[in-house]
């Protein structure tokens, strides 16, 4: 009985992580930009063209690690960055592909500036100017 259970457990182990793709920022860097002017609001923005590798991640559950950047004072909005605050897209000149908007499954969870976290969620690609290129929906902080 014990050997059979152990054998079944070994066979089932790969299924536990099935459906999730561990992703890194290097993969998400697979994007090119065409700069377009928004005449109504008078600003330029980078319209992304995603690589096939990035497109394959759309609407997939991914796992990614990065640095937390709070989006507002109330602590209800967060971003995940490939770099700490001093080097992030908004502050230090990194590219648009190095940050993603987080839509937390539990928005009451408080996260700190530059906290290193691993998150799991569904990746949505966005090519509209008013949101970031990458949005992680139903994001959950993983236990390290």
Predicted stretch roles:
Residues 19-144:
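OB-fold and OB-like single-stranded nucleic-acid-recognition modules
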């Amino acid at each position: 009985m014990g050997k059979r259970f152990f054998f079944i457990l070994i066979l089932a182990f790969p299924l536990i992580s099935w459906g999730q793709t561990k992703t890194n920022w290097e993969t998400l860097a697979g994007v090119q930009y065409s700069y377009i002017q928004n005449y109504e609001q008078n600003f330029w923005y980078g319209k992304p063209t995603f690589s096939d590798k990035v497109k394959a991640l759309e609407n997939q559950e991914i796992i990614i690690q990065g640095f937390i950047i709070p989006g507002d004072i109330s602590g209800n909005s967060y971003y995940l960055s490939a770099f700490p605050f001093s080097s992030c897209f908004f502050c230090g000149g990194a590219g648009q592909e190095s940050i993603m908007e987080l839509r937390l499954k539990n928005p009451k969870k408080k996260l700190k500036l530059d906290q290193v976290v691993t998150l799991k969620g569904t990746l949505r690609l966005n090519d509209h100017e008013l949101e970031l290129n990458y949005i992680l929906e139903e994001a959950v902080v993983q236990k390290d």
